Amino acid sequence: VRSSAASDVYKEDIDYVKQFISLSPSTHILEIGCGEGGNLLPFAELGCKVTGIDRAASRIHQAETFFTASGYKGEFTTTDFFNFSSASRYQLILIHDVIEHISNKEEFFRCLSPLLAKRGIIFWGFPSWQMPFGGHQQICHNRFVSSLPFIHLCPGILYRFLLRCFHETPSCIEELSDIKRCRMTIDTFEQLAEKYGYEITDRQLWFINPHYQQKFHLRPRKLYPVLAQLKYIRNYFSTSCFYITRHRELHD
């Protein structure tokens, strides 16, 4: 059974989503990049029908094991999103800590709307690229370099050189370089949403990511409204960006 500490990790996510959609057993939810299924379990506990996809077979196995141990049903599939097809249409799509890893973001946005039910919504969560650890450098094996803020903003050649100096593995360097290539900013996200017919129903920028509460015992804090309105500057202070979007053609 999931611990109360693990439950708290996702509390802010589900509380945020519940402001914009009524959740019931008839609500069908898809998570893209579901990992071990932690985001989906709170929705399953509310009786929703949940589906998760992930490219990593090991993560899908973890999700299936996790749900079985918790006593809830979930449908999980190992697949790349760009190869995913479904006869179902989803009232809610979850995209948490995924979009910043996608290289072809335009195609990603374009492929989403056919999966949305009429009046369906999408929840997005991602770290702004320029925030202190927007490059995910915390995955480094070297404890010193993993705690260096803003190192990912160095020019690519210098960034890779520094990582090699700290004896990071080639696979780690390649992963971090790929994240640098695929980076996502607040402004880029909002431009893509507009281009592909999505209206932004709500935006919440976090100065302290809600997930830091369980990881680092830091209380979640929203970004000050004045800072949230300052283009470019806000990217450096937003450790997590929550959005709710709707597709205009599905809400006419």
What feature does the model see in each segment?
Residues V1-Y10:
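Single conserved hydrophobic/aromatic residue that forms the stacking wall/gate
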Residues I14-S22, T27-G135, F242-H247:
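Conserved SAM-binding loop
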Residues S4, L41, E45, R183-D187, ...:
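A structural signal for well-ordered alpha-helical segments within the folded catalytic domains
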Residues S7, V17, I233-N235:
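S-adenosyl-L-methionine
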Residues S103-P114, I121-E249:
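S-adenosyl-L-methionine-dependent methyltransferase catalytic module, highlighting the catalytic core
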Residues S4, S88, Y236:
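Structured loop/turn residues at beta-strand edges in well-structured enzyme cores
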